[in-house]
């Protein structure tokens, strides 16, 4: 029996908005709650510029040095070599959001057929997401809406590769207006395409 791994999504209910609660997350499977405020229940990674909770992808503090109340035992130092295990929960949430996007979006049937099998991402697509993620994971520590930017990047890449016509929506352009993110997007697309063409395994490119 496999161990359950929570996939947290931010709660954006009327009650949360009214009371201005923006740090409450809930697992989409077991319905467990997580308060993502930098406390000891968070699993934090020090990116060098900020602290990011690996359970949710939420940027806790842009300047963590000013927040001395944080317990050091729940902070992991960012490593030069990409460590997939630190972002496992975020990757699972990303894949689920991509599935939902392409299932619900009209006019993308061609793309959905290429990347989905029974409403789930095909294994080879999951592998490609996994091996390109190392190029963009640092965005979580740079901006509060890093997760949205990364989702936008993957939607852009997938549509540009698997669609025979231009069907971009407004969501896609938030990652191309910034030259820095546009450069990251191009690197991710190049890695995606080169892996498809050469058939190389993504396992050789990242630390499992």
Swiss-Prot record:
* UniProt-listed Pfam families: Herpes_UL92
InterPro entries, alphabetized:
Herpes_UL92
Recorded family membership:
Belongs to the herpesviridae UL92 family.
Instruction: State what protein this is by name.
Output: Gene 31 protein
């Amino acid at each position: 029996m496999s161990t359950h791994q929570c996939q947290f999504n931010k709660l954006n209910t009327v009650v949360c908005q009214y009371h201005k609660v923006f740090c409450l997350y809930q697992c989409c499977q077991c319905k467990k709650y997580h308060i993502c405020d930098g406390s000891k229940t968070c699993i934090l990674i020090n990116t060098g510029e900020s602290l990011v909770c690996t359970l949710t992808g939420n940027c806790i503090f842009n300047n963590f040095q000013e927040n001395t109340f944080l317990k050091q035992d729940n902070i992991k130092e960012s490593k030069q070599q990409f460590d997939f295990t630190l972002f496992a929960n975020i990757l699972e949430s990303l894949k689920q959001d991509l599935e939902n996007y392409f299932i619900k979006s009209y006019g993308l049937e061609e793309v959905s057929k290429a990347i989905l099998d029974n409403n789930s991402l095909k294994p080879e697509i999951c592998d490609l997401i996994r091996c390109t993620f190392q190029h963009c994971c640092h965005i979580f520590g740079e901006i509060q809406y890093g997760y949205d930017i990364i989702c936008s990047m993957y939607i852009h890449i997938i549509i540009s590769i698997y669609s025979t016509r231009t069907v971009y929506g407004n969501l896609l352009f938030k990652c191309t207006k910034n030259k820095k993110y546009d450069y990251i997007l191009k690197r991710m697309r190049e890695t995606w395409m080169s892996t498809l063409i050469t058939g190389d395994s993504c396992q050789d490119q990242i630390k499992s």
